Regions:
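C-terminal long alpha-helix characteristic of the crotonase
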Residues: 1-5, 12, 53-102
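CoA-thioester-processing core
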Residues: 1-35, 65
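Glycine-rich phosphate-binding loop at the start of an alpha helix
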Residues: 17, 41-42
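Short aromatic/basic micro-patch
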Residues: 26, 41, 56
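Conserved catalytic core of Hanks-type protein kinase domains
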Residues: 26, 38, 75
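Recognition helix of helix-turn-helix/homeodomain-like DNA-binding domains
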Residues: 50
Length: 152
């Protein structure tokens, strides 16, 4: 992740739930609730510290870092990579990943049909997408509403 980037799930504020609950598995219960219930944006350093992303570097270095990381696998037999990947994925399956993903997808559909979500989405033709997203994010001063370059 670029060290000046932000990540989060703003739709949890009004129009959805994540269809994959990897946040719980990666961040633990406390941080997953903190960020998914609020929809707050997470800066790169925090995302790295809490385990949401594995690496942070300047944007100009990302391609080189990805290439270098990928090259670490070139001498490992594909069957060895596949077996280890299946074992890791199975551990997550045993913790309920598939069920959580199915429920997340269902709840995402439900969340988009609540009265509040319908009112929010229904205002897009009149106000425009950028305006309704700004109204969602302005109170939190994040995502597109985040002050930049010394703005306050």
């Amino acid at each position: 992740m670029a060290n000046d980037a932000y990540i989060g799930y703003a739709p949890s504020r009004i129009f959805g739930t994540p269809t994959t609950m990897m946040w719980v598995y990666r961040l633990g219960l406390e941080h997953a609730k903190q960020y998914l219930l609020s929809g707050d944006a997470i800066d790169a350093a925090t995302a790295h510290r809490i385990g949401l992303v594995s690496h942070v570097c300047p944007l100009a270095e990302i391609n080189g870092k990805v290439e270098a990381h990928a090259k670490r696998f070139q001498h490992i037999p594909a069957n060895q990579l596949a077996l280890n990947k299946m074992l890791i994925n199975q551990a997550y399956e045993n913790m309920g990943l598939r069920t959580s993903q199915m429920l997340g997808t269902f709840f995402d559909g439900v969340a988009r049909h609540t009265e509040e979500a319908q009112r929010w989405a229904g205002s897009i033709p009149e106000k425009g997408f950028r305006q309704v997203v700004a109204e969602r994010d302005d109170p939190h001063q994040d995502y597109g509403s985040r002050p930049r370059n010394g703005e306050s």
